[in-house]
Each structure stands twice: as structure tokens, then as C-alpha cells.
């Protein structure tokens, strides 16, 4: 089952004519659709005035009264993040793999936010040292200056969280040059590879990120949660694993970080 979910998360569906790809939580499926549209995941109705951005391309637009939106002809040579934001809804992002993907109408389902949701960051973040190969995953789309090799955020979790199952959700991540990412063809580096990005909660390591993609979840052990107190998430980018006289950090970009309780 884990392998099936993993494959669904990474799959990209190419369609022709009026056939559209529906995106929901990083999973794609095919349906008939004439234009790009953002809809409510429960009602199926179009969501008005949702903001659509492709940060690396400095593109922004908004949906109309029916949730429809247009995308111009944008040159995309490597996977690039598209983000959807609307007040009262969970932030959503997906990875566009090529310019051809934008030629196919897409339907994006977004879910209303819950009271227990915690939005950590909806901006695109560049981790690393700004030193990367042109063959690195998504190197051509890196536009932001690095904030350093790690990202940390403090936030409060209530005692109710300890009675739920909690996850750190990473909307999208690009740029990982791990051994697994290389094996999957996500970069073109001939020999070198990096260690995976590491996730820490209150100073304890809770997971790793090995591949680029959307809607990746890391479970937060309830035993580590400090109820009604400050908690901290830290994401550390990996390092080049080839011998070197200095530390070479993997440059990655992440977007839409949140804590969800179920």
C-alpha cells in the first residue's frame, strides 16, 4: 500500500484535447474539462478569487467567479512549483514537470482548512549555499537567495493535538539530489549525490526527504509534542556525499509547510 500511494503521488498524467488532469493532494487523475479550474473538494463548486502563482517564473493570476483561470505560455524546462492560495482553504501546491503540462486543462481540488490546522509557511523557501551544478534537480529554476542550510519555525500546539495523529505536510519540494532522486531521473549529475534532507521536531529527528514531489507527510510522534507550549520544526538540507575539502550543501526549494491533525 505504501508503494502504491508513493507512486500515485509522483505520477504525471499527460492528456490531449479536452481531457484534463485533476489534482487533489498531489494525486492526479484524468477527467473531461475544457479549462483550468479550482474547485472545492467537497462541493465540487468553483472557488472564486483563488490566487494562482508560479513563484520561480514570477507569475500570478486569480480565478474568476466560476473558479476558472488561464495560464500563459511559460517556458518550463525543469519541474517547477505551482501554488494555489485562498483564505479559508488549506494551501495547495503541485509540481509542473514541463511546459507541455500547461497545455492540458487542469482541475485542482482544494480543501477547506480545519480549526486544528497550523500553517507554518506558504512562501517558497530556498535552503542550501547557492552553490549547485547546472545539472542539479531544478537548478535552472532557482531564483531566490538561500536562507541557509536549515529552516526552523516555532509554533504552539494545544493539548488536543496529543489526542490526534499529527503530520508535517510539505506541499512541494524540488532540488533534492539524493541517491534515490538520481535513480529516479530527477537530476542529471553524473556521479555525485547528496544525503537526504532531515526533519526535526523539538530537536528529535522524525524523518527524511529522499525524493522531489508534492504533499509529502512526516508523522509527528505525540510523545514529542509539548502541549500548549512552544514547539519547533526544523528542516535541514543534505550535504554532498563525495569527498571534498569543504561542506557542500544541497540546494533545495520547498513551499507550503503546515501541520495537520487527523
Which residue ranges define each predicted feature?
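Sec-dependent signal peptide recognition
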Residues: 2-7
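Hydrophobic h-region of N-terminal signal peptides that target proteins for export
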Residues: 11-18
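Beta-strand-rich domain onsets/edges
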Residues: 18-33
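Beta-strand-rich recognition domains
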Residues: 28-31, 42, 95-262
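Short, ordered, surface-exposed loop/turn motifs in non-cytosolic proteins
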Residues: 32-34, 41-56
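Short, acidic Ser/Thr/Gly-rich low-complexity loop/linker segments typical of extracellular
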Residues: 57-70
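Surface-exposed loops/turns
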Residues: 65, 76, 227-228
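A short, solvent-exposed loop/turn motif at the edges and junctions
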Residues: 77, 81-103
Amino acid at each position: 500500500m505504501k508503494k502504491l500511494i508513493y507512486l500515485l503521488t509522483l505520477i504525471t498524467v499527460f492528456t490531449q484535447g479536452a481531457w484534463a488532469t485533476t489534482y487533489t493532494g498531489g494525486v492526479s487523475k484524468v477527467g473531461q474539462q475544457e479549462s483550468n479550474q479550482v474547485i472545492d473538494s467537497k462541493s465540487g463548486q468553483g472557488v472564486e478569487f483563488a490566487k494562482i502563482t508560479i513563484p520561480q517564473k514570477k507569475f500570478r493570476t486569480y480565478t474568476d467567479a466560476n473558479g476558472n483561470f488561464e495560464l500563459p505560455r511559460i517556458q518550463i524546462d525543469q519541474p517547477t512549483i505551482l501554488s494555489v492560495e485562498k483564505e479559508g482553504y488549506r494551501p495547495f501546491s503541485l509540481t509542473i514537470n514541463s511546459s507541455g503540462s500547461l497545455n492540458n486543462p487542469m482541475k485542482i481540488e482544494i480543501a477547506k482548512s480545519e480549526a486544528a490546522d497550523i500553517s507554518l509557511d506558504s512562501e517558497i523557501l530556498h535552503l542550501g549555499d547557492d552553490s549547485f551544478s547546472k545539472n542539479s534537480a531544478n537548478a535552472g529554476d532557482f531564483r531566490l537567495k538561500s536562507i541557509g542550510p536549515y529552516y526552523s519555525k516555532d509554533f504552539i500546539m494545544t493539548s488536543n493535538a496529543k489526542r490526534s495523529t499529527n503530520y508535517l505536510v510539505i506541499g512541494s519540494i524540488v532540488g533534492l539530489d539524493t541517491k534515490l532522486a538520481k535513480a529516479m531521473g530527477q537530476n542529471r549529475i553524473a556521479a555525485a549525490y547528496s544525503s537526504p534532507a532531515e526533519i526535526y521536531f523539538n530537536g528529535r529527528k522524525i524523518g527524511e526527504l529522499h525524493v522531489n514531489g508534492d504533499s509529502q507527510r512526516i508523522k509527528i510522534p505525540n510523545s514529542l509534542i509539548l502541549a500548549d507550549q512552544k514547539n519547533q520544526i526544523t528542516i535541514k538540507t543534505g550535504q554532498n556525499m563525495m569527498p571534498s575539502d569543504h561542506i557542500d550543501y544541497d540546494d533545495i526549494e520547498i513551499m507550503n509547510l503546515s501541520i495537520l491533525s487527523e
